[in-house]
């Protein structure tokens, strides 16, 4: 089966989550992704949050499928020589080291261009070079705090909250992926590679654009009519936290369903659409609200929006969350059950679509991983297990022209 990136070689100098999520997707699209790891150590996530002693952690295996792994010590002369040969043959190099780390290895962008002017250099950092935080170490929640997500997440009477979704890490990887694919297309026109940089702060901010929209509206109006604070609460000079309210102008809230007293996920998310208000009233047994001037428009409803949700909840609390969604869907009401990770892991439809995939690694055995979220008509990514540390070192070196004796000597010299 032909794949979009067949014939593209990627050098993966990334670790933890932001970089590996990007290079894993490149591998799913058919690129030959070579993960370069420290001899005897490897990516730190191989050892983090283990569920089986001395076996690669799920943290690693779920972010590095379809890749090849080599152990390479770039501090040695032989290791640097191998690195230069790899760069010469590669199409893309991706790194997410601390600022300046790859330069200290001797591989500045200028030197890389000399070795291979067609190479595309992808780089993930916490902050842009012009940021005052450029030297701050960045992880997932650091990026959420600096990118505007934390200040706008949570309830108005509580502290900022970070999302459980990887807005700082995997989201940054997906943004870089888009940039790398664009750079590949640009190379087809120019014949030259380029540097593509992605800051975690920028990636989070790009998902918070509606909050920047709201900031400008707040500056002009002094209030935000779709937020729960309107019209009875107060607004400060910055976009407030809105709890579980919808952020796109359509009021929404988390509602209890049957069993909520003991099941922490017995809830649905319910959205009120202006154009679907009549159906909403019929669904919840309040047809009189259709023509009542206190309820007939979104502006009229906002002062007592929580009373409306409480009325809707009187119905949803009597039935199972799946029954609630099935019933409300008949009225074209946007809603969904709050699915636990346990439910997601067992969902047959997600298995069927390839969104959740079972793979097998030689030492770990079978495990679940998240599959490719995009569904293509011309090809289906074949999700394979993550590599063992150094599993492909000899094979990659042989492809570069090294003999068995030379490979043995490099191992003796701790270059691999």
UniProtKB/Swiss-Prot annotation:
Keywords: Transferase. It catalyses: formyl-CoA + oxalate = oxalyl-CoA + formate. Belongs to the CoA-transferase III family. Frc subfamily. Substrate binds at residues 248-250. It comes from the Bacteria. Signal peptide: none annotated. CoA binds at residues 17-18, 38, 72-75, 96-98, 104, 137-140, 273-275. Its EC number is 2.8.3.16. InterPro entries: CoA-transferase_III_domain, CoA-Trfase_fam_III, CoA-Trfase_III_dom3_sf, CoA-Trfase_III_dom_1_sf, Formyl_CoA_transfer. One of its GO terms (molecular function) is formyl-CoA transferase activity. The active site is at 169 (nucleophile). This is Formyl-CoA:oxalate CoA-transferase. Homodimer. One of its GO terms (biological process) is oxalate catabolic process. Pathway: Metabolic intermediate degradation; oxalate degradation; CO(2) and formate from oxalate: step 1/2. Gene3D superfamilies: Crotonobetainyl-coa:carnitine coa-transferase, domain 1, formyl-coa transferase, domain 3. Involved in the catabolism of oxalate and in the adapatation to low pH via the induction of the oxalate-dependent acid tolerance response (ATR). Catalyzes the transfer of the CoA moiety from formyl-CoA to oxalate. PANTHER family: SUCCINATE--HYDROXYMETHYLGLUTARATE COA-TRANSFERASE.
